[in-house]
Amino acid sequence: MEEYQVYLELDISRQQHLLYPLIFREYIYGLVYGHDFNGSIFLENLDYDNKSSLLIVKRLITRMDQQNHLIISANDSKKNQFLSYNKNLYSQIISEGFAIVVEIPLSLQLNSSSEESKIIKYYKNLRSIHSIFPFFEDKLTYLNYVSDARIPYPIHLXXXXXXXXXXXXXXPLFHLLRLFFYEYCNWNNLITPKKSISTFSKSNLRVFLFLYNFYVCQYESIFLFLRNKSSHLRLTSFIVLFERIYFYGKIEHFLEVFAKDFSSTFFKELFIHYVRYQEKYILASKNASLLMNKWKNYLIRLWQYHFDVWSQPRTIQINQFSEGSFRLLGYFSNVRLNRSAVRSQMLENSFLIEIVMKKLETIVPIIPLIRSLAKAKFCNVLGHPISKPVWADSSDFYIIDRFLQICRNLSHYYNGSSKKKSLYRVKYILRLSCIKTLARKHKSTVRAFLKRLGSEKLLEEFFTEEEEILSLVFQRVSSTLQGLYRGRVWYLDIIFSNDLVNHE
């Protein structure tokens, strides 16, 4: 931010909130490939360092400055001289430049106060996504109803671009964004319900993530005054911000919420929790189902009238914890009632007292997980292991190491499961798939290969490696902690889910 602060003062001081001229500034595109923007460990390098030379950027700016290249009609779009050059390269350079420009007013707002600077520094350290589950264990057992739903995708990115342009108060920038989307992008493939926003391909870059995150941010603004109105809930919003790598702050500093438009009685003694990961969110409350249905209707109308997004009421499910479950982060979760009887005696009379305790259960969804393994060619749709022919040309060490790494990652991720039987089945599929891949490479049968190699060591690596490591950690602790280890352990170093886990 400090690198281009001087340039911004020169451009913005003349015309307030006019971001359109920044699109044609050469230093903006130079900053696109600066170390501050390509240093993230989460985004892959696009390998444009050799192509994004200063000469190419100058040519790009020159072509953008020529108005006759930007006048496009329906009949002449294919003949446009601007499109006769490297379309993919230019589209990526321009989209990255757009992303920097539209983030400028937001970053300037957040850098204006020391308190907001602390927020920026805080969210650079990403929180583990598995820290959501200890939060569930502490809070959800005291609640009654849960709403399991998805934030609907915008029908058209023009609506998301219009919202960002309205906040930035730069109409020319909005029209240029629309022109860019029209020429370079297939609108129908940018955001689809079948794919998560975090699984964008390399061609869908930072500007689309920014627009979608801005759209989600506007939706989540409704929950800001929920937290302030509640007499019970005074917690910091518990939201994982993995997909907001380039977002400069929290939603409190994005949008003003008009809390005065809502009656105070509607939020009287509100006890509600909201958790979101990507487009999936969980809304849990202790109040009666009538209030939850009111919020369901309100959210549907909010999407319909404010975001021009139609959402069917049946897509938002409201269930009691004791009767239903919800899916989040690759787990099936529900609240189970544990009933136990305690005998009590007073004088000569004795009687039984029934004690009901709530416990959060997290279960590995074996059917969706097998479907993910089948998609990755580790087994068929019935869960029968098959060989991985793509790796058959690699060395034995490489094949075993790849399978062990996948097995460790899944075991690491699903170690918080209440029941380990499904996890052991997944390990069995991966182990047998590894053996079949090695047998395929050596042109042998599975039985002959195991007889020649010896299966015991291979089996031990798959099944006992993690257990041996953890047993060293817990060998000197009490039996109570050892029982806790045998139950479930949440690893708080997991900051994203891989493709096998992300089967929702």
Swiss-Prot record:
Kindly list the places in or outside the cell where this protein is found, as annotated in its UniProt entry.
Plastid, Chloroplast
Q: Does the keyword tRNA processing apply?
A: yes
Keywords assigned by UniProt, alphabetized: Chloroplast, mRNA processing, Plastid, RNA-binding, tRNA processing
Q: Among the entry's GO cellular component annotations, what is one?
A: chloroplast
InterPro entries referenced in this protein's UniProt entry, alphabetically: Domain_X, Maturase_MatK, Maturase_MatK_N
Keyword Chloroplast attributed: yes
Database matches in Pfam families? Intron_maturas2, MatK_N
User: Which residue positions does the secretion signal occupy?
Assistant: none
Q: Name one GO molecular function term.
A: RNA binding
Q: What is its main location?
A: plastid
A single BP term in Gene Ontology: RNA splicing
The UniProt similarity line reads: Belongs to the intron maturase 2 family. MatK subfamily.
Q: What does this protein do?
A: Usually encoded in the trnK tRNA gene intron. Probably assists in splicing its own and other chloroplast group II introns.
What protein name is recorded for this chain? Maturase K
Native organism: Lupinus argenteus
Q: Which gene encodes it?
A: matK
